A protein has these predicted regions:
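Residues embedded in well-ordered beta-strands
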Residues: 32, 71, 154-158
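Structural motif
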Residues: 70-71, 99
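Glycine/alanine-rich phosphate-binding loops at beta-alpha junctions
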Residues: 2-68, 76
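Zinc-dependent deaminase
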Residues: 1-22, 39, 64, 82-166
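Local cysteine-cluster metal-coordination motifs and their immediate loop/turn environment
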Residues: 44, 51-52, 72-91
């Protein structure tokens, strides 16, 4: 089972990269809807202020009746608050998707476990931490800003053997 979940989460992470450079200050997120071992929908967060990955993945499903017997895989915990878009956790509940697999929790204070809690309170089975390290690494800058309150910094240093910086 873990191998199967990792296969779909790897696809979520790959999809999420499609948002690179367009979603800041939000994180890159990918989502895949799976019905009986087959991907029936997928999406990613394309641009800041527009539909999130879960919304795009669900919208891409041709037969909505399959959602009630499907699993949605998401690289980051579904949001649970109203911002520029409505909460993805509410959409998942409304569509009747019974199972959600999450790569990593969202450290953003307005989400931070609330999305998972909202889903579980509605009777949705939620699995967290699938490929968590990879899911967190995808959004190093976002994670650093949310958890440490500072930008993610990369430093390159070049100096000669005698210690002179060039």
């Amino acid at each position: 089972m873990v191998e199967v979940e990792e296969k779909y989460m790897a696809r979520c992470i790959e999809l999420a990269k499609g948002g690179r450079g367009n979603v800041s200050p939000n994180p890159m997120v990918g989502a895949v809807v799976v019905h009986k071992g087959r991907i029936i929908g997928e999406g990613f967060h394309r641009k800041c202020g527009e539909a999130h990955a879960e919304v795009n993945a669900i919208a891409s499903v041709k037969d909505e009746s399959l959602l009630k017997d499907s699993t949605i895989y998401v690289s980051l915990e579904p949001c649970s608050h109203y911002g520029k878009t409505p909460p993805c956790a509410e959409l998942i509940i409304r569509k009747g998707i019974p199972r959600v697999v999450v790569g990593c929790l969202d450290p953003f204070p307005e989400v931070s476990g609330r999305g998972v809690r909202m889903l579980r309170e509605a009777g949705v089975e939620v699995v967290t931490g699938v490929m968590e390290e990879e899911a967190r690494a995808l959004n190093k800058a976002f994670m650093t800003l949310q958890t440490k309150g500072r930008p993610y910094i990369i430093l390159k240093w070049a100096q000669s053997e005698d210690g002179v910086i060039d």
